[in-house]
Amino acid sequence: MNTATEPLTFAKILKLTSDWLWGMPLLVLLIGGGLYFTIYSRFVPFLYLRHSIQILRGKFSDPNDPGEINHFQALCSALSATVGMGNIAGVAVAVTEGGPGALFWMWVCALVGMATKFFTCSLAIMYRGKDHTGQVQGGPMYFIVEGLGTKWKPLAMAFCFFGLFGCLPMFQSNQLTSIVSEMFLKPNEWFVDSDKNVTALGQGLFGVLMAICISVVILGGIKRIGKVAARLIPFMVLLYGSCALVILFTHAAQVPEAIALIFSDAFTGEAVAGGVLGAVISTGVRRAAFSNEAGMGTEAMAHGAAKTKEPIREGLVAMLGPMIDTLIVCTITGLIILSTGVWQETGNNPDGVLLTAEAFTKGIPIAGPYLLLVCVLCFSFSSMIGFS
């Protein structure tokens, strides 16, 4: 069939636009912009790392400062959105599409993204406003209007509109439904049709259950989100990190080889899908952007509600996000997938969360997939309340 004669549907237009936006424009904006901010700030993210940790611990906090949540709760609220399925499923997709070298470019994007987050979240404190209930709020929709002026309000409205369709919570629910279907619904033949596929009713009911659980948290506002995130984030990172260390310890002999492969493949582009160097770089940058959100503006909403009068202090706290999210959690996932060798195995060629599940099954037999399921539930839940 001649694809040139196929009608240009809305889905095709959306895909063409997405492929273009997530190509060279994204590379220039994220890496180029991040490099500019890094040099312009005279390498603030790296020189003031110790000071940022002191701020996070509350050394300079004043309970009388304006805001709704403390520095730690603000960072956890931001991390609840960033440390999600992008760290588990997104890394697996990056390795499948761009090869091991994509991880290297995720690191590059995270390093320069620290400066981007520093400036973005400093602006969130410098130019913030109040919502209809009188609570202090921040984010691009506020500092565009407060900083640039009311004539730029259409840009703030556009940000909100495109953010709504930016797929952020969709990926979380999609991957969570996928692993729940594979591990529970299909084996128990719950809501399964004659072709052994989960029915729309089963997926819909699971979606309703997720919506109810998330609503209980987000209806309490930024304060409840901050409190839940402050308890959930340390637990899920510790659980996921502990499981990962067990897997890496049992495959310790393969870890040095996996690290070497990341650096060598970063410049050769020998991807699983047969990609080239440009595909490796763009894949790494895309997944890093989705994972740590540096430059996307969403993180500024959480940090904009922090209790502080010093914009730079919150910027220093915010820049820890890409380091925790990409340089630590994403790297752990990548090393698990590479050291266990599941990314090279043939079969159904699963990607996303199912590929990571195979790595957990191989690294921790029997219990591995169920431990990952708990992690996925926590990561997805935290991300969806963070995006709210």
Give the role of each language-model region.
Residues N64-E97, L123-V145, A158-F161, V276-M323:
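Alpha-helical membrane segments and immediately flanking helix-loop junctions
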Residues F43-N70, V93-L103, W107, A115-G149, ...:
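Flexible loop linkers connecting adjacent transmembrane helices
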